[in-house]
Amino acid sequence: MEKKIILFHGSEKVIEHPVFGAGKKHNDFGLGFYCTESEALAKEWAVSSLRDGFANRYTLDTEYLRVLHLNGPDYTILNWIAVLIEHRLFSIKTPVARRAKQYLIDNFSVNVNAYDLITGYRADDSYFDYAESFLNNAISVEQLSQAMRLGKLGEQVVIKSQFAFSNLKFEGFSIAEKDKYYVQRKARNDEANQTYLKMLDDETDGIYMQDIMRGGIRSDDPRIPRNLSE
């Protein structure tokens, strides 16, 4: 990561002074200020079907920040999933899913609050549905890894600590038009869902959540995909 980076935050409003401690604690990586290095992605995340939005632009000095790269080679796809299910709210409908959630948190989760900055892929609702299917033993870890590559997941940069917030400087904003960016986001999501449904028809002898729990599989097992960028 460069010493000084440019970040964009998609929002329905202009945010000149992001506030430490504000936001939703049930986002992907918990409480924080969610950004991306892609202006186009920020614009997609800023709009809805009914309104335009804004891509707020910032610079961030990262020189002395503790940075967690969740999609780097030191972590598996299950580390990423464990962090998601530890923070996101969702209904658990089966005993298998309940045990699976706890197993992943106990054995694969990462303490994101020990870092100033986190980089990792953003899980839109469709992608979180894939994670739920994995928890319910409906798809294998190999299928999960393949599903998470569908639709070109965007990488988000999350500012976690007060120190990191103090290094963030507002530089301006640009308008995100819903007629362009909502259409782009929806098209990518629809394509990913269609490909996912086709993938489910393929036979697989992969590793399922039940296998992981019964076998006591941990992060260092070479059968678990290391990260989403591979």
Task: Please report, for each region that a protein language model flagged, where it lies by residue.
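ADP-ribose/NAD+-binding catalytic cleft of ART/PARP-like enzymes
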Residues: 1-28, 56, 225-230
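Conserved NAD+-utilizing ADP-ribose enzyme module
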Residues: 2-3, 49-51, 62-230
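Ordered hydrophobic segments in well-structured contexts
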Residues: 5-9, 33-34, 55-57, 156-158
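Short, flexible loop/turn elements at secondary-structure junctions
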Residues: 12-13, 39, 62-64
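Residue-level preference for alpha-helix termini and adjacent loops
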Residues: 14, 19, 28, 32, ...
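Extended catalytic/binding region for NAD+/ADP-ribose chemistry, centered on the ART fold
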Residues: 24-49
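Compositionally biased, low-complexity linear motifs
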Residues: 44-60
